[in-house]
Amino acid sequence: MHEIDNKAKEAKEKKAAYGPDIDLKDYCTEGECHEPLENLEQLPEEEKSTMLKAGVDSSEEGRSGSYVQRDTTAIYASSVMDGLEVLPIKEALKLDWVREYYWKLVPVDQDKFTSLAYSDLHNGYVIRALPGAKVTFPVQACLYLHQDALSQNVHNLI
């Protein structure tokens, strides 16, 4: 077992420094699978409306890229600009360069939440602008829960 695995294991009951102590056993970690989308207009109207309240526009107008995760499933990742990558982290982890940034800023043993995100990663995103890229519009991301009492274990890299 690697040192990072041991650190995560040792922190699986460690309380967070801030906020109430939440019992993670009250949440399930197995989410239902959702089909990927070709575009965000395929989302149900109610979900599009809710996302818009959080600033995520399903038309993607004025956006350089988008990432949407429903429960534990990355259902949409897109970039419309050259030199901009928007990827689900599970896909990005297959790329060598991602490992040099993965879990380097936030320690896996910070608390039980980081421990769980490391040991039972559902997904998350990687957003990267390549050297020389001119990204003129924002990238939008939305990670939401459709299933009640689900733990959404994510790690994001920007």
What are these regions (language model features)?
Residues 1-158:
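Glycine-rich and polybasic anion-binding loops at the starts of cofactor/ligand-binding domains
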